């Protein structure tokens, strides 16, 4: 939903500039960001995203991207510790108010399946909820019980796909290996997509950013070996791998 979230917020900002009405939460143009574009109305409303894409829905997972488990206006640069709860936010999805975390996820998945999708999928922050940098950073081996519980929630809801993206441990190969193997043990049907945030792999050297695009020499041979070694290591244990990105125009379709 990340691209759709961007489109929604872009339209709201345009409407604000033209003096047109927008939802209450979107009225302060200084606060809203792409993360704020996902909620019950945009997903399940009369013109919600869950109703789009016709017959291909039965073969596709519907991924709720960054924002589904935090309140509005949250930013990792300001308060990264609020990310990673895995609890469908009731301000964004008021129908789940009063439900347990696992029941919220089941409600979400059931709604998506009822709309013709193969199932629901979740964007996941690569960190434990409440964690922070420095003294509050928690090692991968000390997070196992937390992740067992979150995997159990998804198992209860029959959510079978996680996109594990940015977070305090996003560049930590050991963390990604721990989580991937734990999911395989606790809930084998759960696909872990290791979405590794990195510069384009074919021109990490001599890279420039201009007019909204990346430019570089385009040669994989010029990429530092240690960077490619890290990608190789993640690929060894990954069911699914995503890198940002492999060529000059940054997308999230690799």
List each model region and its residues.
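Intrinsically disordered, low-complexity coil segments
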Residues: 11-31, 47-50, 76-79, 92-102, ...
């Amino acid at each position: 939903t990340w691209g759709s979230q961007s489109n929604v917020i872009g339209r709201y900002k345009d409407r604000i500039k033209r003096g047109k009405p927008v939802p209450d939460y979107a009225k302060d143009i200084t606060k809203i960001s792409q993360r704020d574009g996902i909620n019950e109305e945009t997903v399940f409303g009369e013109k919600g995203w869950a109703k789009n894409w016709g017959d291909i829905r039965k073969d596709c997972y519907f991924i709720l991207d960054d924002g589904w488990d935090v309140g509005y206006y949250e930013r990792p640069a300001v308060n990264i510790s609020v990310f990673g709860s895995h609890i469908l936010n009731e301000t964004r999805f008021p129908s789940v108010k009063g439900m347990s975390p696992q029941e919220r996820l089941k409600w979400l998945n059931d709604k998506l399946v009822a709309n013709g999708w193969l199932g629901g999928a979740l964007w996941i922050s690569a960190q434990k909820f409440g964690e922070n940098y420095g003294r509050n950073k928690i090692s991968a081996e000390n997070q196992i019980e937390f992740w067992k519980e979150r995997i159990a929630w998804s198992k209860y809801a029959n959510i079978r796909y996680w996109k594990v993206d940015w977070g305090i441990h996003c560049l930590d190969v050991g963390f990604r290996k721990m989580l991937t193997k734990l999911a395989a043990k606790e809930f084998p049907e759960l696909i872990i997509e290791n979405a590794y945030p990195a510069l384009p792999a074919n021109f990490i050297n001599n890279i420039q950013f201009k007019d909204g695009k990346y430019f570089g020499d385009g040669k994989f041979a010029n990429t530092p070996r240690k960077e490619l070694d890290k990608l190789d290591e993640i690929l060894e244990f990954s069911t699914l791998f995503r890198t940002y990105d492999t060529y000059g125009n940054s997308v999230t379709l690799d």
